[in-house]
Amino acid sequence: NTNELTVDVRGSLCPKPVIETKKVSDANPDAVITTIVDNEVSRDNVEKFGKSRGYGVAIRQDGKDFYLTMTPNDNLVADGSCEPMSYGNRVILMTKDYLGEGSEELGRNLMKTFWVCMVEADVKPSKIYFINSSVKMVVNDSVHLENIKKLADLGVEIAACGICLDYFGVKEELGVGSITNMYAITDSILGENIVKL
């Protein structure tokens, strides 16, 4: 009488199928999980997730739907159930309020997805610094504030550049984290494992 659970995410685009599967996996590490998706990108991403977690993954296609059945391997310790939050040694330097180059509109949508994925990720950065226009993401009316607050609640250090907040006239609107300066940020860039976005 193995515990079997179904995650039906047909009609959803990435990263939602992986996020929903991960939630069920975290809560039920011993269960056999069948995720149903209706596109190949989601199928591939859920399969990668299952294999990264040590599941045996079987895929069955029915029309345009894909059924991915993930069976836990008994010899693997179920991960995520009792372990403390894991922090990487990375510091993220956010330099603007959209991701990538080419299209700002696309970049703003990507940024929303980025913060959702960051909240769901197993390994968190130790700190996130915000400079230039990225400081707009940590003010009270930001669409990203809720997810960035979740990261702060999970122990990620959030710090925004004071000069930048002043420049955009939003210092009084800071909604999460602390105010820092370029000296501290430069110190971190020179001494820590920095990822610039």
Predicted regions mapped to residue ranges:
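Short, structured protein-protein interaction patches enriched in aromatics and acidic/basic residues
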Residues: 37-45, 129-138, 143-144, 151
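Short internal beta-strands
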Residues: 34-37, 125-132, 157-162
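C-terminal binding/interaction regions
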Residues: 179-182, 188-196
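Ordered, small/hydrophobic-rich secondary-structure cores
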Residues: 1-46
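Conserved mixed alpha/beta catalytic, RNA-binding, or beta-rich assembly cores of soluble enzyme
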Residues: 83-141
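A generic structural motif
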Residues: 65-71
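A glycine-rich helix N-cap at a beta->alpha junction
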Residues: 56-60, 144-168
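Short, charged/polar, Gly/Pro-enriched secondary-structure boundary elements
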Residues: 74-80
